[in-house]
Curated annotation (Swiss-Prot):
A motif (Nuclear export signal) lies at residues 574-582. Keywords: ATP-binding, Chaperone, Cytoplasm, Hydrolase, Nucleotide-binding, Protein biosynthesis. Belongs to the heat shock protein 70 family. Ssb-type Hsp70 subfamily. GO terms for biological process: translation. It comes from the Eukaryota. This is Ribosome-associated molecular chaperone SSB1. Residues 516-612 are annotated as: Lid domain (SBDalpha). Pfam families: HSP70. It comes from Kluyveromyces marxianus (Yeast).
Length: 613
């Protein structure tokens, strides 16, 4: 890689199933990986010898299911006991354990049992995307804009930012996926000047967002957002997988539920069938020797696939209704409905959406897999002063807080301070008081959600305001100040008005939240893993070179014409050097250096032995 640092910031769409990276140098470019693919699987695999990320990891998933990790985005920023985590664990072949309420992934790597946080797994995918960009740009990349689902809460946003830090990236901004896609639609298709209401329908591999934006004169104002951080293509695959499992059991009597390898092979076939059914009405699924020597073969029609997923498909309209209601806009006022995310290729999803908007033609001018990374790269260029076109130079993004933020009050009642769909960044204040006489300490539990009962919302953290003057209940004036930054991340301060005493929290004590020391430790660990990966690659290369050279020398020694060129009395020396090289090759943990020395030794013997007659 050439020296120097890339002055801009890359845009990374960190997806549940696939990730995508883009850069801006006079214009946006989506960067292909070493396989030539413009999207890279969000998979990390661990083996006794090495760590694999991306296509290489996904390709070996069936052979190594327990140590191939995916869906980290469905774990990041969540608690171990969350319903969605418990339900996903039933379908994942890898092991998830409870560490003080936070989920950790347990794998076998380099012959040891190791645990990784979802942030670390995500950081490995981010590192891969960074390396893909560096290979193309030829410079070191230090800055990035990373996208998250609009409906991600504070904990999930902060955890994603931490993943970027572990990957050695300065994450300039966390932006919402549908908003990034709106930029791609506006800038990429030249639609940013004309005034319009645009609904972004973003259904990906694991998450679903709907955002309603007003675009005019290069200003993108998010009016409302809604979604489901646990709905996407993976869920459609799971339903199809369950259907195929039942079919197989009917035909053979065998239940493959406990066989991780068979399940991975069948899931891959289900995913392929789902994609095929977007363009044809029927397809055949075949998996040779799926279980106990029994082959699997089944025909699936598009109608059956739609039937299997009918409830999930229908549920995608609920957030659409919600954003219209929140923005107080009727569906007839929507100028464009823009499709984003691979799962919007499903014809039934398109039909339901078009029918909801009374037969409206859906906007498909942007690539659903690449739009989010495209928008993130534009935002990266703006934040680093690298944007050159008039269209991007004056672009202004006004996003919103997806969920209400507030404080738990007496009786577990949620006191909202920042209502959902408030434009961010923002500062909001609300006054509270004491509930007991002579109370000198007040605890502020901070929640995010839409329910009146705090227990049904997400607890982000809590802090104490001490030194409140002892007064009768209800007399002290306590002001809670909520600051939400452009990343959607919250800082809360509480002030007692008569004394000016204050306490604050940037919610670092929430379950699973990493301290700066832990992040630093993980950064160092990531460097070690990278060094181990590089050492393994060098060893592999040296082994291949030695094998190839041994083979050519063996050919020379046994070929009557070629062996005639060897000096008299030298053949025995060549054979001895050949035996030495071969025995080095047999040593399993021989280092790259040992293998290189063996190759050099053999070359020296052969050079000396070749006759110059």
């Amino acid at each position: 890689m050439a020296e120097g640092v890339f002055p801009g910031a890359i845009g990374i769409d960190l997806g549940t199933t696939y990730s995508c990276v883009a850069t801006y140098e006079n214009s946006v470019e989506i960067i292909a990986n070493e396989q030539g693919n413009r999207v890279t699987p969000s998979f990390v695999a661990f083996t006794p010898e090495e760590r694999l990320i991306g296509d290489a990891a996904k390709n070996q998933a069936a052979l190594n299911p327990k140590n191939t990790v995916f869906d980290a985005k469905r774990l990041i920023g969540r608690r171990f006991d969350e319903e969605s985590v418990q339900s996903d664990m039933k379908t994942w072949p890898f092991k998830v354990i409870d560490s003080n309420g936070a989920p950790l992934i347990e794998v076998e790597y380099l012959g040891e049992t190791k645990t990784f946080s979802p942030q670390e797994i995500s950081s490995m995918v981010l590192t891969k995307m960074k390396e893909i960009a560096e290979a193309k740009i030829g410079k070191k990349v230090e800055k990035a804009v990373v996208t998250v689902p609009a409906y991600f809460n504070d904990a999930q946003r902060q955890a994603t930012k931490d993943a970027g830090a572990i990957a050695g990236l300065n994450v300039l901004r966390i932006i919402n996926e549908p908003t990034a896609a709106a930029i791609a639609y506006g800038v990429g298709a030249g639609n940013s000047e004309k005034e319009r209401h645009v609904l972004i329908f973003d259904l990906g591999g694991g998450t679903f967002d709907v955002s309603l934006l007003h675009i005019a004169g290069g200003v993108y104002t998010v009016k409302s957002t809604s979604g489901n951080t646990h709905l996407g293509g993976q869920d459609f695959d799971t339903n199809l997988l369950e259907h195929f499992k039942t079919e197989f059991k009917k035909k053979t009597g065998a239940d493959i539920s406990g066989d991780a390898r068979a399940l991975r092979r069948l899931r891959t076939a289900a995913e392929r069938a789902k994609r095929t059914l977007s363009s044809v009405a029927q397809t055949t699924v075949e998996v040779d020797s799926l279980f106990d020597g029994e082959d699997f073969e089944a025909t699936i029609t598009r109608a059956r696939f739609e039937d299997i997923n009918a409830a999930l498909f229908k549920s995608t309209l609920e957030p659409v209704e919600q954003v219209l209601k929140d923005a107080k806009i009727s569906k007839s006022q929507i100028d464009e409905v823009v499709l984003v995310g691979g799962s919007t290729r499903i014809p039934k999803v398109q039909k339901l959406l078009s029918d909801f908007f009374d037969g409206k033609q859906l906007e498909k001018s942007i690539n659903p897999d690449e739009a989010v990374a495209y928008g993130a790269a534009v935002q990266g260029a703006i934040l680093t002063g690298q944007s050159t076109s008039d269209e991007t130079k004056d672009l202004l993004l006004l996003d919103v807080a997806p969920l209400s933020l507030g404080v738990g009050m007496a009786g577990d009642v949620f006191g909202v301070v920042v209502p959902r769909n408030t434009t961010v960044p923002t500062i909001k204040r609300r006054t509270f008081t004491t509930v007991a006489d002579h109370q000198t300490t007040v605890t502020f539990p901070v929640y995010q959600g839409e329910r009146v009962n705090c227990k049904e919302n997400t607890l982000l953290g809590e802090f104490d305001l001490k030194g409140v003057p002892p007064m009768p209940a209800g007399e002290p004036v306590l002001e809670a100040i909520f600051e939400v930054d452009a990343n959607g991340i919250l800082k809360v301060t509480a002030v007692e008005k008569s004394t000016g005493k204050s306490a604050n929290i940037t919610i670092s004590n929430a379950i699973g939240r990493l301290s700066s020391e832990e992040i630093e430790q993980m950064v160092n660990q990531a460097e070690e893993f990278k060094a181990a990966d590089e050492a393994f690659a060098k060893k592999h290369e040296a082994r291949q070179r030695l094998e190839s050279y041994i083979s050519s020398v063996q050919q020379t020694v046994t070929d009557p014409v070629l062996s005639a060129k060897i000096k008299r009395n030298a053949k025995a020396k060549v054979e001895a050097a050949l035996a030495d090289a071969f025995s080095t090759l047999q040593i399993e943990d021989a280092s790259a250096d040992d293998l290189r020395k063996a190759e050099v030794g053999l070359k020296r013997a052969v050079t000396k032995a070749m006759s110059t007659r």
